[in-house]
Amino acid sequence: MRNSVAVLALAVALCPGLAQAQAGDNTVKKIEEYRQALVDGNPAELWEARGEDLWKRKRGPKQVSLEACDLGLGAGVIKGAYAVLPRYFADADRVMDLESRLVHCMMTLQGMSRADATRRPFGNGTERSDMEALVAFITAESKGVVMNVPQRHAKEREAYALGKQIFFFRGGPHDFSCATCHSEGGKRIRLQDLPNLTETKDAQRAYTSWPAYRVSQGELRSMQWRLFDCFRQQRFPALEFTSEASVALTMFLARNANGAPFAAPAIKR
C-alpha cells in the first residue's frame, strides 16, 4: 500500500512538468505547421523579381548594369554564387560577403559613391531596400546548391577566426554574446526556437534559411540585417553595414553551414 501511495505521489508531482513539456512540444508543432502553410505563397518572390530588374537595369553615373559583377564564380555568374560566399576577392584584396561585394560592384562598375550604394541597406516597412531586393534575387539562384565556403586563402582563415572571436565575445550592459543564446540546445525566446550554432545541424539549418521574408515586418531580411538586429538586441554598438566585423561573423556562420543545401529565401514569423 505504501508503495502504491508513493508511486501516486510521484506521478502527481511529475504531472505539471509532463503537461508543460507536452504543451511545449505542441506549440513547436503548431509553429512549424504555420510556417509550412506560408511557404507556398512566399512574398519573397516579389523581392526576387525586383532584384532581377535592379541587376539588369543600367544605373549610376556610368549608366551600366550589374551583369558584369563578379560574385566569385566569374563575371555575371550568379547561379550558385551565394553558396561560396563570403570569400577572398583579389581585386579588392579582402574577404567579402554578398552585400559588400555588391557595394564594390556598384562603386566600380556603376560609378556610385559608397554613400549612394549603402543609402538604404534595410527596408523600413514604408521604403523598400534595393540591396535587400538584389540579395533576394541572387540568393534564390543558389537554392538547392550545397554550401561550400572556402578557407584556402589566409585572409579567409583570418576572417573565420575573427568571426569566431566575435561570436563568443561578451559585452554590453547585459554581458551577452552571440553564444549566450546560440551555444546550447533547447533554448527559446517566446515562440522562437534558438538554434545551437556550435552544432553542425543547427548551424546548417539556421544559415541556409536566410535571407527570409518576415511576416511580422512585411519585409525581406538579409543575413546582414539578422546580425545587425542581434547586436541591437544585445545592446551592443550598432553593427556597421558590410563592416569587417559583419563579414567575419558571416564567414564564421557560413563556413559552419558547409555541406548543407541552401534553402532560402525562406519565410519566418
Map each language-model feature to its residues.
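Electron-transfer interface patches adjacent to heme c in soluble/periplasmic c-type cytochromes
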Residues: 22-46, 56-133, 143-144, 169-269
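Hydrophobic, well-structured mid-protein blocks that either form specific transmembrane helices
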Residues: 134-141, 150-151
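Bacterial N-terminal signal peptides
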Residues: 6-16
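Positively charged n-region of N-terminal signal peptides that target proteins for export
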Residues: 1-4
